[in-house]
Amino acid sequence: MEPNQQRSCGSSSDSSATGTPQGSNVAVWRPWHDAPRTHVQNPPTAQQQFYSDNQSHMNDKGKPPSFQHPVKLFWPKSRCYDFMYQEAEELLRHFPVQATISLYQETDSDSDSEEEDIYEN
């Protein structure tokens, strides 16, 4: 490819649409987007090698091979303290990803009837 052709690839309308200066190929990283592919293949890190070696093992158990980020875990407000003390370790042991925990109000009438039984006795 000739040098003139390379310069014509990045037009001024392209640079104004992306908000990056002309001639810059730097993309803004967002954690919820897939990582951009590069032409240079870096050797895998120990952690990447571990996950790639165990990928088939994880798929055999029915777990998804990858997660779409951001991951949001929903937890009932009535069990908020349980989460903070006992069940948090178990949850994180079985779901080791970066996630946001969102508390929600339970609408199940079973939890309400249990509370009423305690006060009636």
From Swiss-Prot:
InterPro entries listed in its UniProt record: Ripply_fam (IPR028127)
One GO CC annotation: nucleus
Start and end residues of each stretch annotated as Disordered: 1-69
Region (Ripply homology domain): 69-104
Highest taxon of source: Eukaryota
Induction notes from the record: By notch signaling. By tbx6 together with thy1 and tcf3.
Coiled-coil region(s): none
Placement of sequence motif WRPW motif: 29-32
Localization in the cell: Nucleus
Key words of the record: Developmental protein, Nucleus, Repressor, Transcription, Transcription regulation
Record field: compositional bias (Polar residues): 39-57
Gene Ontology BP term (one): negative regulation of DNA-templated transcription
Domain notes per entry: The ripply homology domain is required for transcriptional repression.
Task of the protein: Required during somitogenesis to regulate somite differentiation and the positioning of the presomitic mesoderm-front. Represses the expression of genes involved in somite segmentation by acting with the corepressor tle4 to down-regulate the transcriptional activity of tbx6. Also regulates retinoic acid signaling during somitogenesis and is necessary for the expression of aldh1a2/raldh2.
Family affiliation: Belongs to the ripply family.
Official protein name in the record: Protein ripply2.1
Native organism taxonomy: Eukaryota, Metazoa, Chordata, Craniata, Vertebrata
